[in-house]
Amino acid sequence: MNILELSEQEVVRRNSLEQLRNLGIDPYPAAEYTVNAYSTEIKRNFNGDENAAKRQVSIAGRIMSRRIMGKATFMELQDAEGRIQIYITRDDICPGEDKEFYNTVVKKCTDIGDFIGVKGYVFRTQMGEISVHVQEMTFLSKAIRPLPVVKEKDGEVFDGFTDSEQRYRQRYVDLVVNSHVKDIFLKRTMVFNSMRSFFNERGYIEVDTPVLQSIPGGAAARPFITHHNALDIPLYLRIANELYLKRLIVGGFDGVYEFSRNFRNEGMDRTHNPEFTAMEIYVAYKDYNWMMNFTEQMLERICMDVLGTTQVKVGEKLIDFKAPYRRVTMIEAIHEHTGIDISGMNEAELRQVCDKLGVEHNETMGKGKLIDEIFGEKCEKNYIQPTFITDYPKEMSPLTKEHRTNPELTERFELMVNGKELANAYSELNDPIDQRERFEEQLKLSEKGDDEAMYIDNDFIRALEYGMPPTSGMGIGMDRLVMLLTGQESIQEVLLFPQMKPEKVAPRDTKEKFAVCGIPEEWVPVLHKAGYLTVQSMREDKPGKVMQQLMDINKKYKLGLAGLNLETVSAWQEAPYE
């Protein structure tokens, strides 16, 4: 890499790297480093008895701060559990006559961000801080790019690494310098573990189903399309795993579940990412009433396991996941929040309702989609506390069993929390003839231009023809659940690496474009270092200023370039250029 492409700190760190190697120290050793203690455990188990034997420990971590005080140095080491202060003295680390390790390696070649391993004993400093008195230090990894320096005093953070776009793009840095971010993802793991335990205790089986599918079924969503070269067929990234899990119920499993990575080629916002994690579970011989009870019990259990309480604060709202939850039919919900009873309305009447309420709609939308739009625009945001919205119109639910008392409706519920859908569940449709008719209705919607209409999956219908027992299924958005339980209002905060727009890069002319103006190739990196990334930007400054900046960089970095004068720079600026 050209030295001019590096910051001053990066140059210093690379020089330190070279110095370590010259001293015979491998800055990236391959050997295992044995760790027998962690920061939080050391502090928790510290024995303050002055007469007790000093505890010997071996710890490793990243240097997060350092203070050099002549013959002594204090550093703060960050490991997987937290931070602890270490204390290094010249004569302890270098007991003989040769003090070079302390004077050169410790004082000059270590930087914030480096990984080191230290061995020593635990003690309490005169200031009362539990620390490790270092007797041996090993370099484990040299950081050649500086971390953002986040300062904290009296609980207040200064110079924080807080820009959202930077944090999401460089999550590895975010996790290092913002300790609360790691806590979010530790809680995420706890949520998954708690849910998995809840299912396993009841005898349900975790399974894996295909991510690449020939038919993107199980949900109304736009898929990502790819191509299998060997088979020469189009394939789709999974939008849902529902139809495969139901095939397993046909095959004789009483209860199956899967945590699946799903992909939907749709918009991104604070609650949607094109790649997300869902959990779907299907249990034979149950219905949606049973599943409502099961779902609220599950969520109450998860909250207690992860938080120790059922109450969660999201912004200014306090949400309580303690069962039971309120139950409201879709028709009742729309009537409650619009004053309009839509039961029995046809498509034309629903379009009039949309017009009256100011809900956008178009010709591709059928009856179910229109109702969905009304509910989404006028009702959904009002359900802050966990609420089951039940009994959806048949047109909205092509995979759901017809309601046992009203043929216009289906046995479906969605769990609304904080104004958003968290879970979706049915009494599953197991009539193969009815299922085919529902798929054909979806095909008609697709022909009208609805790109979220479901595909016909003939193999799934064939599976139903062999017989599927009465079954209830439930899907839950795991990312949204983690958002709720960690008090986050953006899905990007609970995804380690959320999808991002391409990173913006400043326009930069090539060496060939600079050459058109007579600028030698060796001067182009110098111009870039001076901030002149394009010929046009160079032309906008006075030739004297450009020349002075180039000469300063040439001298500072000892580049040894010659032949620069005011006349030359003026000629560069005046040369014809297109």
Swiss-Prot record:
What does the record give under GO molecular function? ATP binding; lysine-tRNA ligase activity; magnesium ion binding; tRNA binding
The record's top EC class is ligase
Q: Name one GO cellular component term.
A: cytosol
How many and how are cofactors bound here? Binds 3 Mg(2+) ions per subunit.
| Cofactor(s), by name | Mg(2+)
**UniProt EC number:** 6.1.1.6
Q: What residues bind Mg(2+) 1, as annotated?
A: E414, E421
Keywords for this protein: Aminoacyl-tRNA synthetase, ATP-binding, Cytoplasm, Ligase, Magnesium, Metal-binding, Nucleotide-binding, Protein biosynthesis
Subunit structure, as described in the record: Homodimer.
Record-stated family? Belongs to the class-II aminoacyl-tRNA synthetase family.
Q: Which NCBIfam families match?
A: lysS_bact, PRK00484.1
What protein name does the entry list? Answer: Lysine--tRNA ligase
Q: What is the lineage of its organism?
A: Bacteria, Pseudomonadati, Bacteroidota, Bacteroidia, Bacteroidales
Q: What gene does this protein come from?
A: lysS
